[in-house]
Structure formats: C-alpha cells, structure tokens
Curated annotation (Swiss-Prot):
Organism classification: Bacteria, Bacillati, Mycoplasmatota, Mycoplasmoidales, Mycoplasmoidaceae
Protein name (database record): Uncharacterized protein MPN_101
Family membership: Belongs to the adhesin P1 family.
InterPro entries referenced in this protein's UniProt entry, alphabetically: P1_N
Ranges of biased composition (kind: Low complexity): 172-186
Domain of life according to the entry: Bacteria
Composition bias, Basic and acidic residues: 157-171
Region of interest called Disordered, as start-end residue ranges on this chain: 1-25, 157-219, 247-271
Polar residues bias spans: 12-22, 206-217
Organism of provenance: Mycoplasma pneumoniae (strain ATCC 29342 / M129 / Subtype 1)
Length: 428
C-alpha cells in the first residue's frame, strides 16, 4: 500500500482527513514516479520513449523566413540550448498530445503537475498500483482509494453464490409510508450493508380510486437520495446559479458534517490547488503547453520550440465574455468580423473537467460584457500570430487547449484513418 501520509496526502477508508501539502507531495512524486511518452510508427511498433525528466532537449534553429531548419536525415538544426522554461515543466505529467496538421513533426503537449494527477486519482477513488509485496503469508495486497475502493489480487469470488438482495419491511404510521431497499454481499460477518435506494412518499387525502377498480394510491415524491441536484439557486435571486464545493461529494467522511454521521457518506469536494496559489507561482503549479518537434527517423529527432503556462485567473477573467456573448465594435454596431470569430470559438473551459484549477470548485462566467475593449479599434485575430496566441490572453480567443482542438481536430479526424492521431501514448 502506498504511504500517502508521507507524501502530504492522507487518504483511505480508515484515515478520513486529508492533509494538504502540495510542495511535499510534488517533491515525493517527482522522486518516485516516472511518466513518459511512447512513440509508435504507423505500423503500431513502439520506437522509443520520451521521458521529459531525463530528456536534454535543444531549441531548433530557424531560417530567414522563420521556418524551422529541418533535414529528413540529419534532423533539426539545434541551437545548443534548451528553452529557459524547460526546467519548469520537465517534471510535469503529459496528459494529452495533439499533432499539427500542417507539420507532421510538430506536437502540442498538455502538461500538469504530478500532485494534481495523484490527488485526482485519490479523490475519485481510483486504485493505484501496489508498491512492493505484502508482508505476511496469505495476506492479500489491497490498494484503497479515497472512496474506499478496494482492489484485490485475482481470485475466485466464493461469496458470489451467497449474494442476495434484502429489503426492510415497509412501515407505515400516521398516513405516511416509507420503504428502504438495501443490498448486502454475503461472506464474512464484517461486511456492512450498502444502501441502494431509499424513497420517502406520502399519501394524498382522497387518493384512493373509487371507479370500481382495486384501490390505487396516488403518491408524490417527497425525497430521493438519488435526486440531489449539484446546482443550487441563490437565495436572493431565483435566476442566479452558483456551483459550490458542497455540491460535489467524492470522499468518505466519519465526521458528522451536515447532520450526517454515516462514515460512508460523501463530504464536500476540496480543491488541491487554489486559483491564487497557481496565479502566484505559474511555473510550478499551472498547466503548461509544450510545443514539441519530433522526427522519429532523424539523427537529431527531438527539439523543443517553446513552453507556455496557463493562468486560470486570467482565463476566467477574460475568456467567458469573449466567446459567450454577442460581439459589438467600439461604435456600438454589430461587428460581422467578430461574429465570425464567435462562430469559430465555441469551446469552453469547464470547471468540472478541471476543478482543481478553481477556488472551491466554482467558476465565474460574466455574460454581460461585449468582450472587446472600447479603445481597441482593430479587433485583430491575434491567436495565430507567432508567439502570442499561447502566451497572452486576448479578447477574441477561447482557452488555449480549445483552440488547439478546434483548429486541429478536423485534420486529426481525417488523419486518424492512417494512424497519425495515435502516434503518442502516455505510459507510466
């Protein structure tokens, strides 16, 4: 079993409280885990692995027109030094790769800190690989996730034949009835019952049918354990919708928070990194975009173009007004060019997909602004200009990774028939 407490994270079915120490966790994971990209050819043969922590890349040289110097046999012309930001991202985890359709050797890699990946695995109850062998004879290797998920070695399930569904008898009092259905897996006496569904209903007065049919009851749903909507409306205005951390329950708790003392009940989800924490130290805690050149059959096969860090504070402050609202120019008239940009940028940065980048699992979207500054008379599309579309937050650009997928996805879909899309596979 992993020693989670030594890494700054306390998780499992027995220890319920989580210790937040990103610095210690990041340092321990960097020394103990390795992530790499495995390169495949079009025939599906593994060629080599790109381990960023051990890679010593160089920056490619450019000609007078700004194009990368490349020879099919000699490879890329190298400048002799890696980008300045390379040391900031070489220990991060590659989670997604996209290929440039205009250049078969150019890739964009999305990198995130190791502790973020590790924390998300624990929070979502994903079992992690066992480290070493179990002590003692006959003892099973068991890995416990944050939600109590247990993974045992391969063995015959002798309790399968004893599995059955047990239900409590419904009880009625004062004109109300409630039913509860529970499931229990047979086996050892230490197994606990797992509640599958509990619905409380109440009778309406005069609900019995009087049309000669056998008495039928009309009941209305009063409460349902499976109908807890994650979106709650504000108290002051019925139109405002706000996502809160209390709406996302992913980890078990033994405390009686919220009036529920059940040790298996979910507790509010807590973010691993706050937005301000990421904003103050982008190189260490932010997600990063790495532009990578790789030619598998050349002598100088790997080169690094540039590294860009994503700032969630800037993204939430600038992107929603620009791609969710109608576009008007500085004269107050409808700008057809801006409308064209709006139609091209329909992607969005979802706080549920990457909740670790937001405070308390909450994203703010401002749909009242036009998205353009009044002093900006040009309103140029700068996202495809050299070095600016990844580094700066502009009023006419969606999130960076949405740009990559929006502009590259059609080409990648067509190229997938030739095996181009799956050239890289993340290995651990």
């Amino acid at each position: 079993m992993r020693d989670n407490s030594a890494k700054g994270i306390t998780a499992g079915s027995e220890s319920q409280q989580t210790t937040y120490d990103p610095t210690r966790t990041e340092a321990a994971l960097t020394a103990s885990t390795t992530f790499a990209l495995r390169r495949y050819d079009l025939a599906g043969r593994a060629l080599y692995d790109l381990d960023f922590s051990r890679l010593n890349p160089q920056t490619p040289t450019r000609d007078q027109t700004g194009q990368i110097t490349f020879n099919p046999f000699g490879g890329f012309g190298l400048s002799g030094a890696a980008p300045q930001q390379w040391n900031e991202v070489k220990n991060k985890v590659p989670v997604e790769v996209a290929q440039d359709p205009s250049n078969p050797y150019r890739f964009a890699v999305l990198l995130v800190p190791r502790s973020v990946v590790y924390y998300e695995q624990l929070q979502r109850g994903l079992a992690l690989p066992n480290q070493g062998s179990s002590s003692g004879s006959g003892q099973q290797n068991t890995t416990i996730g944050a939600y109590g998920l247990k993974v045992k070695n391969a063995e015959a399930d002798t309790a399968k034949s004893n599995e059955k569904l047990q239900g409590d008898e419904s009880k009625s009092s004062n004109g109300s009835s409630s039913t509860s259905t529970t499931t229990q897996r047979g086996g050892s006496s230490g197994d606990t019952k797992v509640k599958a569904l509990q619905v409380a209903v109440k009778k309406k007065s005069g609900s019995q049918g009087n049309s000669g049919e056998q008495g039928t009851e009309q009941v209305e749903l009063e409460s349902n354990d499976l109908a807890n909507a994650p979106i709650k409306r504000g108290e002051e205005s019925g139109q405002s919708v706000q996502l809160k951390a209390a709406d996302f329950g992913t980890t078990p708790s033994s405390s009686g928070s919220g009036g529920n003392s059940n040790p298996g009940s979910p507790t509010p989800w807590r973010p691993w990194l706050a937005t301000e924490q990421i904003h103050k130290d982008l190189p260490k805690w932010s997600a990063s975009i790495l532009i990578l050149y790789d030619a598998p059959y050349a002598r100088n096969r790997t080169a690094i173009d540039r590294v860009d860090h994503l700032d969630p504070k800037v993204m939430t402050a600038n992107y929603p007004p620009s791609w969710r609202t109608p576009k008007w120019n500085h004269h107050g008239l409808w700008d057809w060019k801006a409308r064209d940009v709006l139609l091209q940028t329909t992607g969005f940065f979802n706080s549920r997909r990457h909740p670790e980048w937001f405070d308390q699992g909450q994203a703010v979207a401002d749909n009242t602004q036009t998205g353009f500054d009044t002093d900006d008379t040009d309103n140029k599309k700068t996202r495809l200009s050299k070095g600016s579309w990844l580094r700066q937050a502009g009023p006419d650009r969606p999130p960076v990774w949405s740009v990559l997928r929006q502009h590259w996805q059609p080409h990648l879909v067509r190229a997938s028939a030739f095996g181009v899309w799956d050239l890289f596979v993340l290995i651990n």
